[in-house]
């Protein structure tokens, strides 16, 4: 096990072999580089123009998609949302889908102007809905991972245990060691592989000068009303595929039916068994196959 000092100096791409193993991929690892566009940081995968854009959930970062992207084998852009990962924080702590999409639109035009698909999970999915409504040229097709515009209502209905790692966003922010952060995360997601959780915490944390560790993401201090995004769904021209975690309560059958009713081009829903909210972390191989199936229909 690496010490805190060794973790501090570890390159962010040093663990990609673990992602390849998790994805069941043999052979050389794909090209990947960190790119910056103003206040937004992202990971650009592959040696050609990105075909897929990935937007993560609240309290996550672009590396949450590493295993899926390695397994998919397509050129991609995984974005750190505002206030997350290596992207800049907002002074007002407002990371609503509406503001996120306004920030991301020019970035995506610069870094992935010809992308065909957007895969968005949780807050990233809601951001993608708003983005598709305001800039339809940027979202040719949309895959939503365990989210609809009823997300805040569902979040309020769940217990802390049911929220899993999402509950960590509202807890302690500073820890005396990396292991203390990892222990808390393991307790929140006991069903998940410890090696995967350790990798996730590594990407989602940073060490302070005093030796303590903190989460990389800002505290979301202002919550907007997501329900208005249902009107955006009404206006979307992009086809939509919904992926649900079979053990997650963040999307209900009622929400699925509402999405089906409102979306002009609803391709269908995939329920991933033995998965909670973060399907890309709980069952990455299943998500790889679903996304590949969507790509193959183009």
UniProtKB/Swiss-Prot annotation:
Disulfide bonds: none annotated. Keywords: Allosteric enzyme, Hydrolase, Serine esterase. Changing residue 146 to A: 55-fold decrease in catalytic activity. The keyword Hydrolase applies. Optimum temperature is 39 degrees Celsius for the hydrolysis of p-nitrophenyl hexanoate. Optimum pH is 8.0 for the hydrolysis of p-nitrophenyl hexanoate. The active site is at 122 (nucleophile), 146, 277. The record marks 58, 155 as: Involved in substrate selectivity. Changing residue 191 to A: No change in sensitivity to Zn(2+). Contains two distinct structural domains: an almost globular alpha/beta fold domain and an inserted cap domain which interacts with the alpha/beta fold domain. A flexible loop plays a functional role in the metal-dependent allosteric regulation of the enzyme. PANTHER family: HYDROLASE ALPHA/BETA FOLD FAMILY (PTHR43194), PEROXISOMAL MEMBRANE PROTEIN LPX1 (PTHR43194:SF2). This is Esterase Rv0045c. It comes from Mycobacterium tuberculosis (strain ATCC 25618 / H37Rv).
């Amino acid at each position: 096990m690496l010490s805190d000092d060794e973790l501090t100096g570890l390159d962010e791409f040093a663990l990609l072999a673990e992602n390849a193993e998790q994805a069941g991929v043999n052979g050389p690892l794909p090209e990947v580089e960190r790119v910056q566009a103003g206040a937004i940081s992202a990971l650009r995968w592959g040696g050609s123009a990105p075909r897929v854009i990935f937007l993560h959930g609240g309290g996550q970062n672009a590396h949450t998609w590493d295993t899926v992207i390695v397994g998919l084998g397509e050129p991609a852009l995984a974005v750190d949302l505002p206030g997350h990962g290596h992207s800049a924080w907002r002074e007002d702590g407002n990371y609503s889908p509406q503001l996120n999409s306004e920030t991301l639109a020019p970035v995506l035009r610069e870094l992935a102007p010809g992308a065909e698909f957007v895969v968005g999970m949780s807050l990233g999915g809601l951001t993608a809905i708003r983005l598709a409504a305001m800039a339809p040229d940027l979202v040719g097709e949309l895959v939503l991972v365990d989210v609809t515009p009823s997300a805040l209502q569902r979040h309020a209905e769940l217990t802390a245990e049911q929220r899993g790692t999402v509950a960590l966003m509202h807890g302690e922010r500073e820890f005396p060691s990396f292991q203390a952060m990892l222990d808390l995360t393991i307790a929140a997601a006991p069903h998940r592989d410890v090696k995967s959780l350790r990798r996730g915490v590594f990407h989602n944390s940073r060490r302070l000068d005093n030796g303590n560790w903190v989460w990389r993401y800002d505290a979301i201090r202002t919550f907007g009303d997501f329900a208005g995004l249902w009107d955006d769904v009404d206006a979307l021209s992009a086809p939509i595929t919904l992926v649900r975690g079979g053990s997650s309560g963040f999307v209900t059958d009622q929400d699925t039916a509402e999405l089906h009713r409102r979306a002009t081009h609803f391709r269908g829903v995939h329920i991933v068994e033995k998965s909670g909210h973060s399907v890309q972390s709980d069952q990455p191989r299943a998500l790889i196959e679903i996304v590949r199936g969507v790509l193959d229909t183009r």
